[in-house]
Swiss-Prot record:
InterPro entries: Smg. Pfam families: DUF494 (PF04361). It comes from the Bacteria. PANTHER family: PROTEIN SMG (PTHR38692:SF1). This is Protein Smg homolog. Belongs to the Smg family.
Length: 153
């Protein structure tokens, strides 16, 4: 999924410039991506589309996020730490964090990693045309580097 998202970010200015899902799926197949990766990415994009009513503005509520038992059973501690870091740095709003967590909970537990959370965060921020602080953006973009080689051309 990471490579598919990197491809989308590289080839489309933003979420709105992507073709409809069925056309995008064919385009990604022609680009050589695995159908399972394409399906997972399209599912995550659908979650984002259905969550578009959330605010992209970072909230300054200072509220503490309490994770449910299901979330603590599935989300690694490092992922929960990343979510807290992104809130503290005002890189994502509380609503955006909830969308990311919701998307992560749709992924098999053994596939949930910090890099997966970073990539989903990038996908969400790209979809919302959000600006990021440089250091936070660099940290998130590091997830798009596989085997120390950029996936984007």
């Amino acid at each position: 999924m990471t490579e598919v998202i990197a491809y989308l970010i590289e080839h489309f200015q933003d979420f709105d410039t992507c073709p409809p899902p069925e056309d995008l799926g064919m385009l990604l197949e022609e680009a050589g991506f695995d159908t399972m990766e394409i399906g997972n990415t399209l599912m995550m994009m659908e979650v984002l589309l259905n969550s578009s009513e959330f605010s992209a503005e970072p909230a300054g509520s200072g509220a503490l996020r309490v994770y449910s038992k299901e979330e603590t059973d599935n989300l690694p501690q490092e992922v929960m730490g990343l979510m807290q870091y992104l809130i503290e740095e005002k890189a994502v709003s509380c609503e955006q964090r909830e969308i990311i967590i919701h998307a992560l909970m749709h992924i098999p537990g053994d596939e949930i990693t910090v890099d997966t959370a970073k990539v989903l965060t990038l996908l969400l921020l790209w979809a919302n045309k959000s600006e990021l602080p440089v250091l936070v953006g660099d940290e998130l973009m590091s997830a798009l580097l596989l085997d120390n080689k950029p996936t984007m051309n």
